[in-house]
Amino acid sequence: MARHRNVRGYNYDEDFEDDDLYGQSVEDDYCISPSTAAQFIYSRRDNPEEEYGYEDLKESSNSLLNHQLSEIDQARLYSCLDHMREVLGDAVPDDILTEAILKHKFDVQKALSVVLEQDGVQTLKEKSERAVCAGQPSKVISRSSQSESEIVPKVAKMTVSGKKQTMGFEVPGLPSEENGHNVRAPYKGPPGDDVSIASPNVPETGTPKSTAHPPSLQTSEELGCTPTPLRKSGKLRQQIDVKAGLEKRQGGKQLLNLVVIGHVDAGKSTLMGHMLYLLGNVNKRTMHKYEQESKKAGKASFAYAWVLDETGEERERGVTMDVGMTKFETTTKVVTLMDAPGHKDFIPNMITGAAQADVAVLVVDASRGEFEAGFETGGQTREHGLLVRSLGVTQLAVAVNKMDQVNWQQERFQEITGKLGHFLKQAGFKESDVAFIPTSGLSGENLTSRSQSSDLTKWYKGLCLLEQIDSFKPPQRSIDKPFRLCVSDVFKDQGSGFCVTGKIEAGYVQTGDRLLAMPPNETCTAKGITLHDEPVDWAAAGDHVSLTLVGMDIIKINVGCIFCGPKEPIKACTRFRARILIFNIEVPITKGFPVLLHYQTVSEPAVIKRLISVLNKSTGEVTKKKPKLLTKGQNALVELQTQRPVALELYKDFKELGRFMLRYGGSTVAAGVVTEIKE
């Protein structure tokens, strides 16, 4: 109750006797001390000389604005600056960009190359740090002039000795807000002062040369700061030796692109996953994790397949759906491995992988009934063999898998090789380019080393699978041809720009190169190149790379686009003529027949507009003009039309980019090569 009495007996009148001064600070009633004023209040009277110098600098700069560039040249300069800003961002100061543009007479490509060849951001940081260090002895410019400092050249160095001053400026190429002109001329100091220009390669337009200074006036060494010299680029981008660089980069090993194909459930992913594990590309900890997870999912035998089947849906269904890509090395080769899907629903993805391959491994199941199911009509073994041969693969290794389930029987192996060998010969493979190897993907027999099993060694004395891959001959790379890259994936990465992945079919690319995307007909710049998850400065034909691009909207790029050089672009068309080979089809092909065109990584609906002629298979001579229909096994010249433009190359110019496949109703009906581009 004592608290209640205190509240009831409280005298509130004492609280209302004070004046209401809560609207102002208590410190307003007291004078500021002289020491505080000297520390925090700026006095203009302390810097009369600097105020005079700045005003003269401003007047001199304004007086030179109207004597540098014409309005047309200013507009060209602003356009070039905007274009280079899109590529470089804010890392490079405008004065360096302006200097490069004017030095190369408004040629954006040359100016951009010069800026990128220099050490770039690191050198610029060093310059800015040294500029700040050199500016420390000078006094602070008044705050009232900071709002107008955008039109004043940046002070690179200032050394004072006696009454004379030695100043240097890096002239920025920023537009003036007052009259729309460009500050480009060297600064001419106040009357009576000796001025030296620190910016190199500045064109002189009606400005007298600076006078030389005696050594006694230079005191920059006393301040501990020296002017940053311009650094020369190591070697020109045009002088790169790609062939020598390839040998040096790969340690003398040759590049080989390998695709693994075969019927569904033949054991492709398990076979190659176990090989990668035996080669040391997959560590034991990761492999143990896959084994435990596969056991929990009730798929213990799929542990090695999970090395390549990374997505949850692929692991859940136990079927490869997309092309898995990885890298491993043999004694003489650097191999890019592509694990293609075997299910018939994912044949388009398999074509994408096969179109990027140099050689192939065909995996067949040796189990009773399984080989027959994949090899007979409707199986994917036949179709995959035809597809890879039609797409330019000439060397093939046939891995007869799951031989342990038939106790390594020589009779079963010979039965399979007899049937497959006859078919592959009809498909166009040479007997010398086809090798048959008995393997077991689950147990790892005869993969990386020759088998020690007595059941196998008593009748097989040949190579293991890894030795056969190492014996493949890599194709001749089209490094000297114009640059071509087929986009297989597009994604947004961290930072500016976006990324595209694909195989370089011809030529080479370097960071900073201008690229043209077809058929969107949009240009961009290669900001970065990644090869096997490692950043590189360049990449050449045969490499599977990821390019970081800037200067283009990601919406305009799709899977199937082709990047090329702006000077030697690829043609985009909707109508073209081609020579096609008809496969086993149930319905004859007639005029107006709808097909699905598979070309590299693109899949586009098309229509056969004209049947021009039937050709002889061996000689190519015309045997019949204007046929009404085409049946299986015929070789014909036709004209196709696509719904949207497709970037194509003639087969005679680019064999890698001149092949395509035609599918209808879930099956491959024809393979062809481009002979003429109409429009």
Curated annotation (Swiss-Prot):
GO cellular component, as recorded: cytosolic ribosome; Dom34-Hbs1 complex
Localization: Cytoplasm
Single biological process term from Gene Ontology: regulation of translation
GO MF assignments: GTP binding; GTPase activity; translation elongation factor activity
Region (G4) location: 401-404
In-chain residues carrying the UniProt-annotated modification Phosphoserine: 63, 113, 145, 147
Enzyme class: hydrolase
UniProt-listed Gene3D superfamilies: DNA helicase RuvA subunit, C-terminal domain, P-loop containing nucleotide triphosphate hydrolases, Translation factors
PANTHER family registered for this protein in UniProt: TRANSLATION FACTOR (PTHR23115)
Protein name: HBS1-like protein
Lineage of the organism: Eukaryota, Metazoa, Chordata, Craniata, Vertebrata
Gene this chain is encoded by: Hbs1l
